[in-house]
């Protein structure tokens, strides 16, 4: 049985980039793409992805959708792990709690974080009862607001996105995300959570740090192959 590792953290901290580099540079790896890409791949089950909520009630409905989606993603991770692969998930179920924690404070939507916590407990209970393995490890990537702004502009230019696409990089949201993940980094979780500050790290350095933490070997390429 392979390990299941979730890559999570603040917006634009390098989660998807890390997963792409892992897939390219490490053997016997399974990658579970982020929720929106996973939903597009499985369009028959998820024909429409909810928009950013405009009210507490919309957020609670969104939570139900994304918890169902996360269960499918976790099942996909288990499928890879049962093949003996080391599995990396581009974000995981705690992302839902992170969003609820942030939106409750920023928008004043009382009760949405508690609602997410209740759904999370149901999610964990269901997974255990069904024999679905939960993640073995969490890699949390963190970057400050200034660095996130810089990376977002660069990524938008590299990937052809509009420069106005900034819904997930507002300073107060990033601050709340950092606060949430720090709250999770309690002593009881130290064997499960690895927090990496990516502010002054290159993509390659982040990849090498993850390989060191997880005792994974990078592929050895022949000259000119990479």
Tell where the protein language model's regions lie, with residue ranges.
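Conserved substrate/cofactor phosphate-moiety recognition/catalytic segment
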Residues: 23-75
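ATP-binding Walker
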Residues: 13
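Walker A/P-loop
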Residues: 16
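ATP-dependent NMP and nucleoside kinases share a basic, alpha-helical "lid"
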Residues: 74-82, 86-159
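Hydrophobic anchor at the beta1->P-loop junction of P-loop NTPases
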Residues: 7
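NTP-dependent small-molecule kinase module
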Residues: 149-226
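P-loop (Walker A) phosphate-binding loop of NTP-binding proteins
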Residues: 10
């Amino acid at each position: 049985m392979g390990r299941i590792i979730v890559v999570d953290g603040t917006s634009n901290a390098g989660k998807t980039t890390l997963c792409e580099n892992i897939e390219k540079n490490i053997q016997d790896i399974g990658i579970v793409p982020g929720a929106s890409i996973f939903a597009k791949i499985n369009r028959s089950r998820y024909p429409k992805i909810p928009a950013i909520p405009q009210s507490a009630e919309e957020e609670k409905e969104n939570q139900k959708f994304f918890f169902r989606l996360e269960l499918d993603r976790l099942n996909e991770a288990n499928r890879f792990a049962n093949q003996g692969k080391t599995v990396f998930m581009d974000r995981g179920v705690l992302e839902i709690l992170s969003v609820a924690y942030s939106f409750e404070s920023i928008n004043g939507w009382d009760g949405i974080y508690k609602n997410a916590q209740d759904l999370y407990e149901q999610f964990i209970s269901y997974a255990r009862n069904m024999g679905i393995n939960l993640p073995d490890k969490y890699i949390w990537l963190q970057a400050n607001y200034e660095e996130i702004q810089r990376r977002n502009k660069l990524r938008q230019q590299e990937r052809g996105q509009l420069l106005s696409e900034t819904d997930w990089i507002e300073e107060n949201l990033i601050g709340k995300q950092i606060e949430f993940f720090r709250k999770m980094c309690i002593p009881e979780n130290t064997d499960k959570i690895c927090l990496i500050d990516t502010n002054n790290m290159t993509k390659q350095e982040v990849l090498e740090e993850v390989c060191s933490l997880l005792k994974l070997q990078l592929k050895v390429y022949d000259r000119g192959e990479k």
